[in-house]
Amino acid sequence: MLVPPEASRCIVVTSLPCGPINEANFNLEMRALRPLEPGEFLVRLHWLSVDPFMVSRLRAEANYTAGVSVGDVMQAYGVGRVEATNSSQYAHGDFVTGFFGMREWAIDNGESQVRKIDPALGPVQTALGVFGLAGITAYFGLMEVGAPKRGETVAVSAGVGSVGLLVGKIAAFHGCRTVAIVGSDEKVAAAVTTLGFDAAVNRRSARLDLDLAQACPDGVDVYFDNAGGDLYDSVLQHMNVGGRIIVCGRVASAHLAETKLDVGPRDANAILVKRLRKQGFLATDYACRAPEATATLAEIIREGGTLPPEDVVDGIDQAPRALVRMLRGDNIGKQLVYIGPEKVT
């Protein structure tokens, strides 16, 4: 049995970025752990999730939820084991996931989006990916907003990231042609040869328009947009009449001081002429329906035989580096940070 320490190592925000997020915006610090109050429990975190939404939490501009301030522990989802408890709901030894922040130890009362993990679904860290936020995002974004039909073409930006990979799997499961838009020729090859996409395009290609036309010979019916920026403008030209655009992320503007500076060609004419439907999407709107996504994704994985890949960085001190590399697009699959005392599956 682990003996809880008097303090926990945490990743603390030392400055808000003006431009690209970098490791200098964070510092590793010790924060004291107080005694548990009634209803609380203590979690030893084993895994931290690194997600694109973290960009918005570090912006000073208004957003859909409160961000972080200088001196705060950086926000993040995590998975860990309950090591001490004053709660009737969470027992010693339970594995849980929640919005615990970038820290090794967390005190909670169950209100930080905490839920117990079913080990039968797979390794516990999958609660941060396919059976967590990424899965909810991909499933409900595609199925509820995109509403793909068999035989349609579904394109997804950040196509070999945690959400993009799942969008591809779900779309293929429903009989769609799948096209990954990625950031390198190596990822193009991986997307098609090992990750199950029908075609892939390098967004940095000098002949992007031609590449999109070749990858999507019948046009694009559903575009799952994780990036925004110039790439959105390019894909827009290939949308079919009646197409649907899911606005899920804006990682292409992560380098800007303010996202309002991300201004490209106006899209109103294309939306009008092609009768497109463009809708913003937040996974948190569907959190109460998470079991629906989990059940479907478990079925897809059983039929496909493999879990999506993970990109793991070791050590809490490396969490800022993991965030930076994810924003650069260096990862293939779910970006995770392992901080546990031992590998637990």
Where are the language model's segments positioned?
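Glycine-rich beta-strand-centered segment in the early N-terminal region that forms part
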Residues: 32-50, 58-102
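Glycine-rich phosphate-binding loop and adjacent beta-alpha segment
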Residues: 230-306, 341-345
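NAD(P)H dinucleotide-binding glycine-rich loop of Rossmann-like/cofactor-binding domains
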Residues: 74-81, 89-158, 305
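C-terminal hydrophobic helical "lid"/dimerization subdomain
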Residues: 1-6, 284-345
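Short amphipathic alpha-helix with an adjacent loop that forms part of the alpha/beta core around
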Residues: 207-218
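Short, glycine/polar-rich helix-capping loops at beta-to-alpha or helix-loop-helix junctions
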Residues: 103-104, 183-191, 262-268
